[in-house]
Amino acid sequence: MPGMISKNPDLEFDSLQPCFYPDEDDFYLCGPDSAPPGEDIWKKFELLPTPPLSPSRAGLQEPPPGGGSIAVGRGGPGECRPVDPLDWASELLLLPPEAELWGSTDGADFFETGLGASNNLNSIIIQDCMWSAFSAREKLERAVSEKLQSKPPAAAPPPPPPVVPTAACRRREQPQRGPGRAELGGSVPECVDPAVVFPFPVNKREAAVPSGGETPRGGRRPGPAGESRASSSSGDDTLSDSDDEDEEEEDDEEEIDVVTVEKRRSSSNKAVTTLTITVRPKNTTFPSVRTQQNELILKRCAPIHQQHNYAAPSPYMESEDVPPQKKLKAEVPRPVKPMIQPKSKSSSPRNSDSEDSERRRNHNILERQRRNDLRSSFLTLRDHVPELVKNEKAAKVVILKKATEYVHSLQAEEQKLLLEKEKLQARQQQLLKKIEYKRTC
């Protein structure tokens, strides 16, 4: 299988092309160094389920004392392996699934770190950062804790290489520790430093944190080896934790302003309740003062939520806490005139409202009485008209017309009666004169 790797980086994936062509002739023509397939052809189709893993720091360790170049591979001591990490990736793709990447049974891992069977932990811990998740992180932490408890820690670990502070940059320079390391650092500008991606060291002997190293950006102090391994599963997690710590520090710095703003709001009788939680184990006196201020804010703002009546007494009269100075200034006794004027102003609208309501009520009563009188008058008029006496459903217009006609007829009869009266009176006078003449004769 190692012989199928193409030495030309442009043709490094040509070894995989026969897997996708049905031609058997092309299947065996993989390259000049190609070997015939094994008995089980299907093993060639069993590719790794993950993208190519980043090159480990095992290939970047100190060169041998002889000063020669680093030989990377799984063969014997005299066999030469490609130094380019691109060849490492292609060789990783062509490994059989039963082969161990980071540790082998014969005491040497894939990159010949020479750590023996104790380095099998790395095959569990170091995974690709694209496939990391919370469940995988918990499993890794559990496996790390079990293996750390079962195996004693190594003594006198050398310091690991310094970590590049920015994780967003893809181009990282490999740390150069020897003459053979310069070629690796210059030939692979796009290779990610495993120290940034994996917080777990490839070598167990490099687990401890150096005492004189730089402190992280988040301000955390380095803990023991177990805690450093179980802290996170990728460099992104560490950077996000440091960003969260920076945000928490900014929030802690802004909390004093929040407390002052809440005091101003409480002085203006606004119902505001805040609960600020601070976790700062370094400072001992500052959190205690902060919690006392928060308790005061909660005690002052809680009764304001229950105060619905503006005429009710101030809640500070019943509470044992001393109100702030602004509240004392606001509660200074005012002169009598300003207090009476609002009452008179408030009473005048009330009086005007009451007068308007009484006026409306009286108007409604009078209007109702007028309508009743009008109806009764129409009924009486209808009763006086001889044509409408028995007509209860007569309209008002009909009643008025018939009534006018009846009045005109009555007036004509009156005139006739007056003329008849005058005639009768004149005859009476003639008769009286005749009676007096006969008496005299």
From Swiss-Prot:
Q: Where is this region: Disordered?
A: 49-79, 144-189, 206-275, 310-369
Q: Which GO terms describe its biological process?
A: regulation of transcription by RNA polymerase II
Q: Where is the composition biased (Pro residues)?
A: 154-164
Residues spanning the membrane? none
Query: What's the domain of life for this entry?
Result: Eukaryota
Q: Does the keyword Nucleus apply?
A: yes
Question: Biased composition, Gly residues: where in the chain?
Answer: 67-78
Pfam families (UniProt xref):
HLH (PF00010), Myc_N (PF01056)
The question of whether Ribonucleoprotein is a record keyword is answered with no
Residues annotated as domain bHLH = 358-410
Q: Which portions of the chain have biased composition (kind: Acidic residues)?
A: 238-257
Q: What's a single GO CC term here? A: nucleus
Q: Sites of the modification Phosphoserine?
A: S240, S242
Q: Where is the composition biased (Low complexity)?
A: 222-237, 342-351
Against SMART domains, the record matches this protein to: HLH
Q: A single Gene Ontology molecular function, please?
A: protein dimerization activity
Q: Where is this region: Leucine-zipper?
A: 410-431
Tell me where it resides: Nucleus
Q: Give UniProt keywords alphabetically.
A: DNA-binding, Nucleus, Phosphoprotein, Proto-oncogene
The record, for PANTHER family, names: MYC PROTO-ONCOGENE (PTHR45851)
Task: Give the protein's recorded name.
Answer: N-myc proto-oncogene protein
Q: Which organism is it from?
A: Gallus gallus (Chicken)
Give the classification, highest ranks: Eukaryota, Metazoa, Chordata, Craniata, Vertebrata
